[in-house]
Amino acid sequence: MKISPSEITKIIEEQLKRSDREIDYFEAGRIIQVGDGIARAYGLKGVMSNELVQFENGEYGLALNLEEDNVGIVVLGDYREIKEGDLVKRTGRIIEVPAGEALLGRVVNPLGIPLDGKGPIEASEHRPVEIKAPGVVMRKPVDTPLQTGIKAIDAMIPIGRGQRELIIGDRQTGKTAIAIDTIINQKDQGVYCIYVAIGQKTAVLARIIDKLEETGAMEYTTIVAATANDPATLAYLAPYAGAAMGEYFMYSGKDALVIYDDLSKHAAAYRELSLLLRRPPGREAYPGDVFYLHSRLLERAARLNEEHGGGSLTALPIIETLANDVSAYIPTNVISITDGQIYLDPNLFYAGNRPAINVGLSVSRVGGSAQIKAMKKIAGSLRLDLAQYRELLAFAQFSTELDKATQAQLIRGEKLTELLKQEQYSPMPVEEQIAVLYAGTRGYLDDLPTDKIRQFEKQLLQTMRQKYADVLKAIREKKDMTEEIEAGLKKAVEDVRQAFVS
């Protein structure tokens, strides 16, 4: 009996169809060295840069160094269970984090794993942590203000939605306080917030979470935490994970704010990883691509045009300086990447001027076009007045006789400095800021004792809320200083001043 080749093929095909054996095909390698959170593997020929790989014990790693004969992998979990000779396999994907409104009110690590004990997160989608920043044609100029609720910032260093504004200063000068106040002030503003804690003490982070819950700000906030006891890999990934979560809102046509606290520790974590991976060190032992580390992160903040949904992602990176040195490597890098900086001066802080913003060294390069017209008209001369006051103050120390104009300028500067002081966790709506600054810039406080200024401010706001609520409402809605609004403000300030003086 002759069997044709086609019949043999048919029989083989039928047998194969009946077979239920599945072949699990994957590319794998072997660990040749492990230690200090770094594993070196041989045999992963097709692995991609930044690809997620899985170890035999279930832990994941990130392929960062692709060398001729081995791959340098940073371990994302506990590396002590991984040993030489273990199998490591490719996953074919890059790190993704959950994104969406399910993350609001939650505390997660940079891999999106919940840390708050409130159960699993049912995210609507996952986004890659590293993604290309929006191109030029997708963007539009910054034109909408992001109110921080801090008088000194909203008046003189305004921030717009889609801007990158650096907060820089020595340790314990109030950098995080400004960021937290900004989050609290976004209530009912339609801005979703992501706070990224990099290398912070757990106790400090717990205090921040308590404050945000107490003020009701956790409803629209996600916290991404890589604390001081987490591996350097998680500290390195944290800001990118935070940016990915914020981009979800931006690409959905909404507004988001992301705070990176702080990028000095992020750069230190990256330096640690790079040195362990034997990458050549450069200035201050940082690797050569440390500028790109932060530029690719901060370029993801943008204001999209209407064709792409019109959403925005605003970034407030924080940098900690050492002994007031803003010309160090990392501070100068980030200053050159961002659209301005808020410089906090330790001398002002210890003198009791809080927030301790040094107006002369702080600038917002694009926020001016986003500032509302009413604030522009009221605070236009404020920055110059304060800068001149600081200059005159230095000269006045060496001079005994001052002319009347100089004396008047010194008095005005002193009153304005006092007026710009603000308690922590008490952000102020923009219409109330305008009312207070109107009194200061128009000279109504010049002859009041300096220690009574805060009391006057309190009384003015109380009266405005009770008797002149229509004026505040008009400022809030029209966003401009019309003759009618100015007349209302003038009457309110004069009434309060008269009652206060008497």
Curated annotation (Swiss-Prot):
Enzyme class (EC, first level): translocase
MF-aspect GO terms: ADP binding; ATP binding; proton-transporting ATP synthase activity, rotational mechanism
SUPFAM superfamilies listed in its UniProt record: C-terminal domain of alpha and beta subunits of F1 ATP synthase, N-terminal domain of alpha and beta subunits of F1 ATP synthase, P-loop containing nucleoside triphosphate hydrolases
A family per Pfam: ATP-synt_ab_N
Residues the record marks as site: Required for activity: S362
GO cellular component: plasma membrane; proton-transporting ATP synthase complex
Keyword Lipid biosynthesis: no
Binding residue positions for ATP: G169, D170, R171, Q172, T173, G174, K175, T176
Membrane association type: Peripheral membrane protein
Top-level taxon: Bacteria
InterPro entries found in the cross-reference section: ATP_synth_asu-like_sf (IPR023366), ATP_synth_asu_C (IPR000793), ATP_synth_asu_C_sf (IPR038376), ATP_synth_F1_a_nt-bd_dom (IPR033732), ATP_synth_F1_asu (IPR005294), ATPase_a/bsu_AS (IPR020003), ATPase_F1/V1/A1_a/bsu_N (IPR004100), ATPase_F1/V1/A1_a/bsu_N_sf (IPR036121)
Record's keyword terms, sorted: ATP synthesis, ATP-binding, Cell inner membrane, Cell membrane, CF(1), Hydrogen ion transport, Ion transport, Membrane, Nucleotide-binding, Translocase, Transport
Catalytic activity of the protein: ATP + H2O + 4 H(+)(in) = ADP + phosphate + 5 H(+)(out)
NCBIfam families: atpA, PRK13343.1
Family from the record: Belongs to the ATPase alpha/beta chains family.
Function in brief: Produces ATP from ADP in the presence of a proton gradient across the membrane. The alpha chain is a regulatory subunit.
Oligomer status and interactors: F-type ATPases have 2 components, CF(1) - the catalytic core - and CF(0) - the membrane proton channel. CF(1) has five subunits: alpha(3), beta(3), gamma(1), delta(1), epsilon(1). CF(0) has three main subunits: a(1), b(2) and c(9-12). The alpha and beta chains form an alternating ring which encloses part of the gamma chain. CF(1) is attached to CF(0) by a central stalk formed by the gamma and epsilon chains, while a peripheral stalk is formed by the delta and b chains.
Name of the protein: ATP synthase subunit alpha
Organism: Kosmotoga olearia (strain ATCC BAA-1733 / DSM 21960 / TBF 19.5.1)
